[in-house]
Every structure is written in structure tokens, then in C-alpha cells.
């Protein structure tokens, strides 16, 4: 028999000092004779024309739960037409449990980025971009777990089209063997792994009736190599209808084994009226033999105030979990107290 676990999410935000805000979040989930609750406070302050700082503090509560259950986050960002720079730190305690949602990794993260975007005197090119970013994850003893470094060269044309070249380097430290693929089963050994790759992306102007993005990546991957191709688009046959297809392909060749993956998706957006919007998203992932469907209804009952009804269902189509599924029904209401 399927289990029903009701949950509630509440969000309160107040605008202050013009473009800044302070807020709070509470989540509660019941089930299996227990509960999980999370309280959080956050703020985003625009302290100068181009400078923003933000912070968040959260804690989870469960019966008989011990240990550290905190999340701490702080960030600062400078953004103007020529220079963009930012820095962020995140600390997630080992025993923090969000209850609603998930945490990918309970570690400490530090990251920073800087970008220069000069505007040349050209009728063809609107702006160039030269940027770099570095993200670093470590454990409580400051041992490296993950490092991601990227250098980007980009060109923005006067037509609205874009081209980007990314040079990537990544380090992963595995504390135990890792199954990178289940079908076929491919296991990676514990230890330090480092690889580099190059990604090229072409993006057309999104103001056109038909818009598309094409990207390809080639390079090392863990202990071997990987080739990837992704294509996505957006077509607007009329003002009330838009179609957003997407497809991604990965060809992975490792000494431990080789495999390919396919990810296919289609999002359909339809405006019944100016105040009633609908969307349906369908996706299939070959790597997990997993199909997913999301149906969303959005009613705008007042300017910036909305009611959302979202139904999600995922289902395994093959393998050991064939036939198993998970579904959820979500009601979300946004209401501005001060207008």
C-alpha cells in the first residue's frame, strides 16, 4: 500500500529599504509516527547600487535527534555592466534533515567567481565575456572532497544570439566505491579523480518565434572519456501556446565499463486566459529507466498573487524497480500582505 505523508511549507517575506528583503521559512512533515520541522531566516540586502549581500540560517527538528542540525549560508555579489564578482560560503551540518526536499551533500562549500564584460565598438558584437569560477567542497577536517573550476569565453551579438566556450576542470575524492551507472553496472574505485573537458554552446535570441540552444562537450571523465550533445528549443505557434522540447545524449567510455544515456523532455505551456496558465512537462531518463510527468495550474487572482496546483508523478519503467512510482499533489498560495 502506498504511504501518504502530508507536509506544509510556509514562506513570509517583507521588502525593506527599497530593493532588499528579510524573510522566514517553516516546513513541517508528518508520517510514520514521527515528524520533521525546519525553521529558517534569510535576508538579501542591496547596500549599494551594484552590491548585494545575503545570508540564511536554518535548523531542523526531529524527535530524539542529536548532533549538529544547522545550515549557515552567506554571500556577497557585485554586478555592473562591466564587472561581475561574487563569493559564497555554505555550511551544512551532518545531522541536518530538511524533511521536505533533500540535501545533495552535507559538507562545507566555498565558491567565488569574477567576470569582465567589455563592450566593443562594433556593429556585430554587443558584449564579450571573460569569466572564471571556482567551487570548493571540504569535510570538517578541511580535506578536499570536490573542486570545480571553469573559465568561460563568451560573445553576445547585436542580434541577441550568443556563443560560449567553457574550459572545465574537476576533482572528486571518493571515500568509497561509487556506482556511476546501474544499467549496465559500472563501479568507480575510491580515491582522487581529476579530469578536464571543453564545452561549446550556441544560443539563438529568445525573442524569436522559434529559438534554440545547441551544446556539445568532449574531454576526460573520471577514469575515461565522455562525449555529450544537448539540444533544446522554444516554439511559439501563437501567443497562448509554447512548446519547449529538449534532448541530451552522453557517450561514456571508462576502463570499468562503457554506457550511453538519453534524456528526453517536452514542456507545453498554454494560457487559457491572461489569469489562468497551465503547463505539462513530460520527461524520460534512460539511465534510470525513469519517466516523469508534471502538471501545473497557475491562477493569478491578483497582481503578483497566485494560486498554484501541481501534480507530480514518477515511475520506473524497467529494471529491479519496474512498476514502482511516486506521486505528489502540491498547493501553493502567494499573497502580499502589504500593497
Regions found by a protein language model. Name each.
Residues 14-18, 47, 157:
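Short, solvent-exposed loop/edge-beta patches enriched in aromatic
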Residues 56-339:
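Exposed, low-structure sequence patches enriched in small/polar residues
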Residues 7-9, 21, 40, 197-199, ...:
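Short glycine-rich loop/turn motifs
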Residues 33-36, 44-46, 52-62:
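Extended, well-ordered alpha-helical scaffold/bundle regions in very large, multi-domain proteins
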